[in-house]
Regions:
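A boundary/linker detector
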Residues: 1-3, 14
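Rieske [2Fe-2S] iron-sulfur-binding domain
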Residues: 14-101
Length: 101
Protein backbone atom coordinates (compact mmCIF):
# COMPACT_ATOMS: atom_id res chain seq x y z
CA UNK A 1 0.00 0.00 0.00
CA UNK A 2 1.32 3.43 -0.96
CA UNK A 3 1.65 6.20 1.59
CA UNK A 4 1.96 9.95 1.28
CA UNK A 5 5.28 11.18 2.69
CA UNK A 6 6.21 14.78 3.52
CA UNK A 7 9.10 15.82 1.25
CA UNK A 8 9.20 19.63 1.45
CA UNK A 9 7.36 22.79 2.40
CA UNK A 10 5.68 25.09 -0.08
CA UNK A 11 8.14 27.97 0.43
CA UNK A 12 11.17 25.77 -0.33
CA UNK A 13 10.44 25.52 -4.06
CA UNK A 14 9.95 28.78 -5.93
CA UNK A 15 7.60 28.94 -8.90
CA UNK A 16 9.32 27.71 -12.05
CA UNK A 17 11.94 25.64 -10.22
CA UNK A 18 12.58 22.08 -9.14
CA UNK A 19 14.28 20.28 -6.28
CA UNK A 20 15.54 16.77 -5.58
CA UNK A 21 13.80 15.17 -2.59
CA UNK A 22 13.79 11.68 -1.07
CA UNK A 23 10.76 9.61 -0.19
CA UNK A 24 10.46 5.90 0.46
CA UNK A 25 14.12 5.38 -0.46
CA UNK A 26 13.63 7.00 -3.89
CA UNK A 27 15.10 10.20 -5.28
CA UNK A 28 12.26 12.25 -6.71
CA UNK A 29 12.30 15.47 -8.74
CA UNK A 30 9.70 17.88 -7.34
CA UNK A 31 8.59 20.92 -9.38
CA UNK A 32 6.49 24.04 -8.79
CA UNK A 33 4.57 25.41 -11.76
CA UNK A 34 2.24 28.27 -10.90
CA UNK A 35 1.77 27.00 -7.35
CA UNK A 36 0.94 23.48 -8.54
CA UNK A 37 3.42 20.79 -7.53
CA UNK A 38 4.48 17.78 -9.60
CA UNK A 39 6.76 14.84 -8.86
CA UNK A 40 8.61 12.55 -11.26
CA UNK A 41 11.53 10.16 -11.03
CA UNK A 42 14.76 12.09 -10.59
CA UNK A 43 16.56 9.79 -13.04
CA UNK A 44 16.68 10.63 -16.75
CA UNK A 45 16.22 7.44 -18.77
CA UNK A 46 18.87 8.54 -21.30
CA UNK A 47 21.94 8.26 -19.05
CA UNK A 48 20.72 8.70 -15.47
CA UNK A 49 21.05 12.47 -15.12
CA UNK A 50 19.40 14.24 -12.14
CA UNK A 51 16.18 15.79 -13.49
CA UNK A 52 15.52 17.79 -10.32
CA UNK A 53 18.68 19.79 -11.05
CA UNK A 54 17.63 20.67 -14.61
CA UNK A 55 16.38 23.97 -16.02
CA UNK A 56 12.60 24.42 -16.00
CA UNK A 57 10.67 25.94 -18.94
CA UNK A 58 6.91 26.05 -18.45
CA UNK A 59 5.98 22.50 -17.47
CA UNK A 60 9.14 20.93 -18.88
CA UNK A 61 12.51 20.15 -17.34
CA UNK A 62 15.75 19.75 -19.28
CA UNK A 63 18.20 17.12 -18.02
CA UNK A 64 21.42 18.90 -17.07
CA UNK A 65 23.63 16.12 -18.46
CA UNK A 66 22.59 15.73 -22.10
CA UNK A 67 19.57 17.97 -22.64
CA UNK A 68 16.75 15.42 -22.75
CA UNK A 69 13.46 17.17 -22.00
CA UNK A 70 10.46 15.88 -20.03
CA UNK A 71 7.00 17.25 -19.32
CA UNK A 72 6.88 16.92 -15.55
CA UNK A 73 3.07 16.95 -15.47
CA UNK A 74 3.00 13.60 -17.31
CA UNK A 75 6.57 12.25 -17.19
CA UNK A 76 6.55 12.09 -20.99
CA UNK A 77 9.83 12.65 -22.84
CA UNK A 78 9.63 15.47 -25.39
CA UNK A 79 12.56 13.91 -27.29
CA UNK A 80 11.26 10.34 -27.54
CA UNK A 81 7.47 9.80 -27.52
CA UNK A 82 8.01 6.16 -26.48
CA UNK A 83 9.87 7.18 -23.31
CA UNK A 84 8.40 8.21 -19.99
CA UNK A 85 9.66 8.55 -16.41
CA UNK A 86 7.60 7.58 -13.36
CA UNK A 87 5.15 10.15 -11.98
CA UNK A 88 4.11 10.39 -8.35
CA UNK A 89 0.90 11.80 -6.89
CA UNK A 90 1.36 15.01 -4.91
CA UNK A 91 -0.92 16.59 -2.34
CA UNK A 92 -0.69 19.56 -0.02
CA UNK A 93 -1.38 19.52 3.70
CA UNK A 94 -1.24 23.15 4.75
CA UNK A 95 2.26 24.23 3.70
CA UNK A 96 3.58 20.66 3.61
CA UNK A 97 4.11 18.94 0.25
CA UNK A 98 3.48 15.20 0.31
CA UNK A 99 4.35 12.63 -2.36
CA UNK A 100 2.76 9.19 -2.68
CA UNK A 101 5.34 6.39 -2.70
Amino acid sequence: MADFVKVARRGEIADGTGKVVEAGGRKIALFNSGGNFYAISNTCVHQGGPLGEGDVYGTCVVCPWHGWEYDFTTGQSVDDPMTKVACYSVKLDGDDILVEV
